[in-house]
Curated annotation (Swiss-Prot):
This is S-antigen protein. It comes from the Eukaryota. S antigens are soluble heat-stable proteins present in the sera of some infected individuals. Residues 576-585 have a biased composition (Low complexity). Residues 1-23 form the signal peptide. Residues 96-113, 194-209, 218-233, 274-297, 322-337, 362-393, 402-417, 442-465, 530-553, 560-569 have a biased composition (Basic and acidic residues). InterPro entries: HPI-Adhesin/Ser-rich, S-antigen. Residues 51-585 are annotated as: Disordered. Sequence repeats lie at residues 102-109, 110-117, 118-125, 126-133, 134-141, 142-149, 150-157, 158-165, 166-173, 174-181, 182-189, 190-197, 198-205, 206-213, 214-221, 222-229, 230-237, 238-245, 246-253, 254-261, 262-269, 270-277, 278-285, 286-293, 294-301, 302-309, 310-317, 318-325, 326-333, 334-341, 342-349, 350-357, 358-365, 366-373, 374-381, 382-389, 390-397, 398-405, 406-413, 414-421, 422-429, 430-437, 438-445, 446-453, 454-461, 462-469, 470-477, 478-485, 486-493, 494-501, 502-509, 510-517, 518-525, 526-533, 534-541, 542-549. Residues 102-549 are annotated as: 56 X 8 AA tandem repeats of E-D-[EK]-V-S-N-G-[RG].
Length: 585
């Protein structure tokens, strides 16, 4: 192969030499040489008997056709060429576009808006922005960027660049890269970015209301707290982002990234990762990576990288490795994945509930705590995230990771998950209940109730209520994000990662590896990861993990194993009843 390439290159250069030497000659007409310069050439006598005196290719074509004009005609052609050349010269370099070092550039089919530096677009530093049906508006702690219908917008701590319909935009606190078919938007540093196909930010089909500060926000057509059937409302202590029906919105205490149509977004006290239907996402303590349906969006506290169509992206607190479609990393076909630090990892086909050190997260197919079929309400002590029907939402006291429909987290095909630190792990096919160091979490297929240390989350088919450590629903001590039916929302204390339909992303607190097509991602450091077929919520600073396709249990601090999901569920019924009773009051 190398020999073939070498011969091909040699022949190519020989051809160029012959062509340049014998095929063309420079324009030798002194009257035109100053206008055309060296970039205009004329054929040699081989094709032009007159050997070119101020003639252009168009003129030579006429000669090839047998036209032989007299000297007078040739002179008139030369004079015409002079006039044309002057016009051409006058038109050169007409348009130039520049932007400032700290400025934003946006483009896109039907409009894009982005900002950079420390500026806000379509909203204010600490202000809220809402928009209309198919509009996009977002804001961030200090910077906000919204974009249009199928466009993408991003901003960055220092610089921002957005692009159009099928373009990708990324930014990062320091560096950011994103891509994707129907692109995603990312931001980094202390900026917020939202996007979506028909996205909505801080708005909904029938509109929503958001506020900031330490206030509460409710909305929704039939919805519950922080969102409505097809609407979304969110607010945050400093940042707020909500989006509409099929949109994506994200914000973060410091960094937030959301992606597109059926993508998923997550948040975390410090790091959060959620993914979508068949996607995998993992996050890392300091870094963040997300991707979209077939697109990718990412941002990072420091650096961010996202990738495209069915690509994989990974990052890590220090190191991260993720792989692709049917690959596995940090786990094997029948292998298991553990979590790092003091965190636990759970998974399960339809299971899912975990909470974090001080935060609570629950979810369910048609439920509502931190997510629901069409409703969403979630909160967190510092960050809040809710999502819609097929979406995934997660938050965590410090770190949280959830994933989507058929995904697995930190575990393998037939494997189970263990817990760490001081946490217990229980699982079950259709019911999971786990709690963390000091938190309790319960969930079920169609009903979920979980609470955190100082948090409480309850849900119902069409109603939800969640609050945070000191916050009310749909808002967070610092940040709040809600989204709509098929939307994704994420925020993160410092870093956020979301990804899309069939994508994979992984990270690690120190080192993280995620894999495969229907595999899931694990996290490390002090992060938690949970997954489940159609709903997943997990967290864990010192958190609990539940897993198992058909139930698996891992040992807690005392090495106790829980294998029977039914018995475990029975043990939690009384707690669930008490929590529901308290919420009803």
């Amino acid at each position: 192969m190398n020999r073939i390439l070498s011969v091909t290159l040699c022949l190519f250069f020989i051809y160029l030499y012959i062509y340049k030497t014998y095929g063309k000659v420079k324009n030798t007409d002194e009257g035109l040489s100053n206008i055309y310069g060296a970039k205009y050439y004329l054929r040699s006598g081989l094709f032009n008997e007159k050997n070119g005196k101020g003639q252009k290719y168009e003129d030579l074509e006429e000669e090839k056709e047998g036209e032989n004009d007299d000297e007078e005609d040739s002179n008139s052609e030369e004079s015409n060429n002079d006039e044309e050349n002057e016009l051409i010269k006058g038109q050169e370099g007409v348009e130039q576009e520049t932007h400032g070092s700290e400025d934003e550039v946006s483009n896109g089919r039907e409009d894009k808006v982005s900002n950079g530096g420390e500026d806000e677009v379509s909203n204010g530093g600490e202000d809220e922005v809402s928009n209309g049906r198919e509009d996009k508006v977002s804001n961030g702690g200090e910077d906000e960027v919204s974009n249009g219908r199928e466009d993408k917008v991003s901003n960055g701590g220092e610089d921002e660049v957005s692009n159009g319909r099928e373009d990708k935009v990324s930014n990062g606190g320091e560096d950011e890269v994103s891509n994707g078919r129907e692109d995603k938007v990312s931001n980094g540093g202390e900026d917020e970015v939202s996007n979506g196909r028909e996205d909505k930010v801080s708005n909904g089909r029938e509109d929503k209301v958001s506020n900031g500060g330490e206030d509460e926000v409710s909305n929704g057509r039939e919805d519950k707290v922080s969102n409505g059937r097809e609407d979304k409302v969110s607010n945050g202590g400093e940042d707020e982002v909500s989006n509409g029906r099929e949109d994506k919105v994200s914000n973060g205490g410091e960094d937030e990234v959301s992606n597109g149509r059926e993508d998923k977004v997550s948040n975390g006290g410090e790091d959060e990762v959620s993914n979508g239907r068949e996607d995998k996402v993992s996050n890392g303590r300091e870094d963040e990576v997300s991707n979209g349906r077939e697109d990718k969006v990412s941002n990072g506290g420091e650096d961010e990288v996202s990738n495209g169509r069915e690509d994989k992206v990974s990052n890590g607190g220090e190191d991260e490795v993720s792989n692709g479609r049917e690959d596995k990393v940090s786990n094997g076909r029948e292998d298991k994945v553990s979590n790092g630090g003091e965190d636990e990892v759970s998974n399960g086909r339809e299971d899912k509930v975990s909470n974090g050190g001080e935060d609570e997260v629950s979810n369910g197919r048609e439920d509502k705590v931190s997510n629901g079929r069409e409703d969403k309400v979630s909160n967190g002590r510092e960050d809040e995230v809710s999502n819609g029907r097929e979406d995934k939402v997660s938050n965590g006291g410090e770190d949280e990771v959830s994933n989507g429909r058929e995904d697995k987290v930190s575990n393998g095909r037939e494997d189970k998950v263990s817990n760490g630190g001081e946490d217990e792990v229980s699982n079950g096919r259709e019911d999971k209940v786990s709690n963390g160091g000091e938190d309790e979490v319960s969930n079920g297929r169609e009903d979920k109730v979980s609470n955190g240390r100082e948090d409480k989350v309850s849900n119902g088919r069409e109603d939800k209520v969640s609050n945070g450590g000191e916050d009310e629903v749909s808002n967070g001590g610092e940040d709040e994000v809600s989204n709509g039916r098929e939307d994704k929302v994420s925020n993160g204390g410092e870093d956020e990662v979301s990804n899309g339909r069939e994508d994979k992303v992984s990270n690690g607190g120190e080192d993280e590896v995620s894999n495969g097509r229907e595999d899931k991602v694990s996290n490390g450091g002090e992060d938690e990861v949970s997954n489940g077929r159609e709903d997943k919520v997990s967290n864990g600073r010192e958190d609990e993990v539940s897993n198992g396709r058909e139930d698996k249990g891992g040992a807690g601090t005392d090495g106790e194993l829980s294998h029977n999901s039914e018995s475990h569920t029975k043990n939690k019924k009384s707690k669930n009843s008490i929590i529901n009773m308290l919420i009803g009051m």
